[in-house]
């Protein structure tokens, strides 16, 4: 993700997707589903690793190849590597596994950062949709739980991403002025992120927020820690 190290599909997005993915996995496990968490979390971590631009993801195969290479180094057999990589390449079509549905939903939840809670369309999510997984099983619809999840996700995004005014155009702002301000904010974000070594980035910037403010994220926290 050299093209976008901190932005829409950079490591901030991936870290939030990991938080959301682990919480969703906890919800599924509470409902009696089995979840291959090893494959799921690594697929989330790699799902945008092959991207060369923002917008529609045209590089899923490259991201999947990076995951296959990583799992090969971990000693995983071919069939397992292919299944894990398939969570990336098939995540937008079918969601035929629990893990695929979780990945797609965890990725999509971060769209709230761009569209806002009220502008987010839940049809982006395979979570709680009537999609068959592992036979005819599907997570029952629970509008109240889904709304609570979205509210907590929105709050978490607000606490772990740049303020909207840093990345959105202001009223009557010229395109040139906006680009200059956006570029300055991006450089500041890179400098901030670079202050923490990569090995502590996730825990320091994201997991610690969830734990320190768990009273604001009861649903996310309870299922993340499950």
Please describe what each predicted stretch is.
Residues 54, 73-76, 93-96:
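Short helix-to-loop capping/linker segments positioned immediately adjacent to catalytic or ligand/cofactor-binding
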Residues 35-55, 63, 84-93:
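His-Asp-centered metal-binding catalytic motifs of divalent-metal-dependent phosphohydrolases/nucleases
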Residues 31-32, 71-78:
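Inter-helical turn/loop segments and adjacent helix faces that build the functional surface
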Residues 55-56, 115:
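Short, function-defining helix-loop hinge/capping sites that tune catalysis or transport
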Residues 11, 57-58:
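Short, conserved micro-motifs enriched in small and acidic residues
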Residues 3-33, 46, 93-226:
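Divalent metal-dependent phosphate-bond-processing catalytic cores, especially two-metal-ion Mg2+/Mn2+ enzymes
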Residues 77-85:
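Membrane-interface starts of transmembrane alpha-helices
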């Amino acid at each position: 993700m050299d093209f976008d190290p901190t932005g829409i599909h950079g490591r901030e997005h991936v870290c939030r997707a990991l938080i959301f993915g682990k919480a969703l996995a906890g919800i599924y496990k509470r409902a009696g589903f089995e979840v291959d968490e090893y494959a799921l979390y690594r697929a989330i971590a790699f799902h945008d690793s092959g991207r060369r631009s923002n917008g529609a993801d045209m590089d899923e195969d490259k991201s999947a190849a990076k995951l296959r290479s990583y799992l090969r180094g971990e000693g995983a057999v071919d069939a397992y590597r292919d299944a894990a990589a398939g969570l990336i390449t098939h995540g937008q079509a079918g969601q035929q596994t629990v893990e695929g549905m979780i990945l797609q939903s965890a990725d999509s939840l971060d769209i709230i950062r761009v569209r806002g809670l009220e502008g987010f369309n839940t049809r982006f999510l395979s979570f709680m949709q009537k999609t068959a997984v592992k036979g005819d099983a599907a997570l029952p619809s629970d509008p109240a739980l889904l709304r609570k999840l979205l509210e907590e996700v929105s709050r978490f995004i607000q606490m772990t991403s740049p303020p909207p005014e840093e990345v959105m155009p202001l009223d009557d702002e010229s395109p040139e002025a906006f680009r200059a301000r956006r570029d300055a904010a991006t450089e500041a974000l890179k400098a901030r992120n670079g202050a923490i070594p990569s090995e502590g980035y996730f825990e320091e910037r994201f997991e610690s927020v969830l734990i320190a403010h768990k009273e604001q994220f009861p649903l996310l926290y309870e299922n993340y820690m499950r």
